[in-house]
Amino acid sequence: MTTPASTPAFQPNRHCIGIGRRALLQLRASLEREAAPYVASTLQEAGFAGGEEVYQALVAWCREEYGVERPAELDAQYLGEAVSRFFGELGWGRLTVRQLGSAVLALDSTDWAEAGDEGGSEFPSCHLSCGLLADVFGRIADGLAAVMEVECRTRSDVRCRFLVGAPETLAAIYERMAQGLSYAEAIGS
């Protein structure tokens, strides 16, 4: 008789479900066609609702890959690496994490799954990701986090760039952008 192989702690099928990139893009396209004024908020809410399960998957993955109980136990260098590898392995795309100013992180990706390759959109379109990342990073920080996408491949930008910070910080940045500043000027970087 043989002993069953040990089961790894991180099992994506126990924490998350997979959906194809085309399904995600079609969902956004259908919502834009049928419910245009509500697309961003609807997808952000859905992403935020899914954040807890993705965070639990990240916890299990970090335990297995890095030997820590919580992602927050990793120093900044390893946390950025862990987040990039984790989202890459789940199929979302690789992220580069960098500090912008004193209170904002930038998450950059040239292959983010939610971004359409067609280009030409007027605004950044990774709404589900914004909600999802806000919940995940809020749980990492053990507080509230907000996420705002400021560059998007769907808009023909080279990359998707998500800003992560405290809600009041991103609200102030958004207000400065509404007055005509670029996001870099609004952050002061």
Language-model segments: which ranges?
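N-terminal accessory segment detector
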Residues: 1-105, 111-128, 149-189
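Active-site helix/loop of acyl-thioester processing domains in fatty-acid/polyketide metabolism
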Residues: 124-142
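Hydrophobic beta-strand-centered segment that forms part of the acyl-chain substrate-binding groove
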Residues: 141-149
